[in-house]
Amino acid sequence: MTRDMPDQLGRETPRDGTVLAFDYGEKKIGVALGNFITRQASALTILPNVTVEARFDAVGELIRQWTPVRLVVGMPVNPEAGPDDEEQPSMRLARRFGNQLNGRFNLPVEWVDERYSSRAAAMAGAKRGALDAEAARIILQQYFDELPL
């Protein structure tokens, strides 16, 4: 059994295990996959976001298939917003999605600032149909890159 190591915020960071990351959108959810050993993220798939039931059935299937130890959700932070400003609708939706992931699947959820992930994915040459999965990959890679060694 591996021991977890605390990250800079005191949370336990596994030494190994799979991570799934999500770029939540009202119509589509990009998904990426990575692990703590290689700390490399790969675009995995795009889930249609049609109904709550279909969304979590699809996520549940991915969780059964990949057995992640942690989930990462991109948080669309507004760089212009101040600390006392009301949370934007896109932030509320992403936070709600992450909280629902935690509640439904009992897995820890981490948040990553994803404000430029879709733009970075497009600039990196991601095809239009793969943009959301590539944005999720960028979110997950940022998460890995910010972990202590």
Swiss-Prot record:
UniProt entry tagged with the keyword Cytoplasm: yes
Entry annotated with the keyword Glycoprotein: no
InterPro entries: RNaseH-like_sf, YqgF, YqgF/RNaseH-like_dom, YqgF/RNaseH-like_dom_sf
CDD domains referenced in this protein's UniProt entry, alphabetically: YqgF
Superkingdom assignment: Bacteria
A GO BP annotation: rRNA 5'-end processing
Primary enzyme class: hydrolase
Entry EC no(s): 3.1.-.-
Any Pfam family the entry gives: RuvX
Record-level GO cellular component terms: cytosol
Main location class: cytoplasm
Function in brief: Could be a nuclease involved in processing of the 5'-end of pre-16S rRNA.
Stored NCBIfam families: RNAse_H_YqgF
Protein family (similarity comment): Belongs to the YqgF nuclease family.
UniProt name for this protein: Putative pre-16S rRNA nuclease
